[in-house]
């Protein structure tokens, strides 16, 4: 039986299932903004507490540590949903060390009716739309009201959890295949270089006698 649909009222979302709801994010979640920590206390040595900067949301890695005073409200833990507020507005489910959240990054806090991982899958496309609608001659900046006004379409919590389980499984498989393909591409690129080098220095006939070129890397 085909599921009944209804208009979402949002042009880029289109129709949604009849039993789904749609609300602005400010009515079903909150945002914790990073702190403008004093860079005088930044270090590249792991003698302080890990600090998440905007570039780390893309990479998922930590390269900066903080040795000053801080409030625990700015702590980020594994499973938290983070958004970079400059550039491409990247989203990441944090899966690294517990860390502090620096300025120009934010943590998405969902209400009890929204699964955090569901939001992590949902937000990237919505933030892409925001990015496209944001005019700028330099780096684009995400504002507080931009996040609060994002329309969130969502089903009951148990269906959100089912959606997350499916996407976790499928995306893991896709990432694994992509990693294998990248390895194969690297091998093929190396073979291509070797083939070209071998052909332009040894010729087509591999049976002819060889002589020392006098150049170490040619042979």
Question: Residue locations for each model-derived region?
Answer:
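Short amphipathic coiled-coil heptad-repeat segments
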Residues: 1-16, 172-218
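Amphipathic alpha-helical segments
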Residues: 17-23, 148-189
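Active-site/binding-pocket entry motifs
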Residues: 31, 57-60, 88-89, 107, ...
């Amino acid at each position: 039986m085909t599921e009944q649909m209804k208009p979402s009222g949002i042009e880029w979302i289109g129709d949604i299932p009849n039993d789904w709801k749609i609300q602005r994010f400010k009515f079903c979640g909150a945002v914790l903004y990073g702190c403008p920590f004093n860079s005088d206390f930044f270090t590249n040595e792991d003698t302080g507490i890990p600090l998440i900067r905007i570039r780390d949301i893309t990479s998922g890695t930590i390269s900066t540590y903080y040795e000053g005073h801080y409030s625990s409200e700015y702590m980020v833990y594994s499973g938290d949903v983070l958004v970079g507020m400059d550039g491409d507005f990247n989203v990441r489910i944090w899966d690294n060390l517990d860390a502090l959240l620096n300025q120009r990054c934010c943590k998405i806090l969902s209400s009890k009716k929204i699964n955090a991982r569901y939001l992590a899958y949902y937000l990237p496309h919505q933030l892409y739309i925001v990015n496209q609608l944001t005019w700028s001659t330099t780096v684009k900046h995400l504002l507080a009201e931009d996040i609060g006004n994002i329309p969130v379409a969502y089903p009951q919590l148990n269906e959100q959890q089912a959606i997350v389980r499916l996407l976790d499984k499928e995306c893991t498989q896709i990432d694994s295949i992509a990693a294998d393909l990248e390895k194969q591409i690297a091998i093929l690129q190396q073979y291509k270089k070797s083939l070209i080098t071998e052909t332009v220095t040894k010729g087509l006939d591999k049976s002819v006698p060889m002589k020392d070129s006098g150049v170490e890397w040619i042979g």
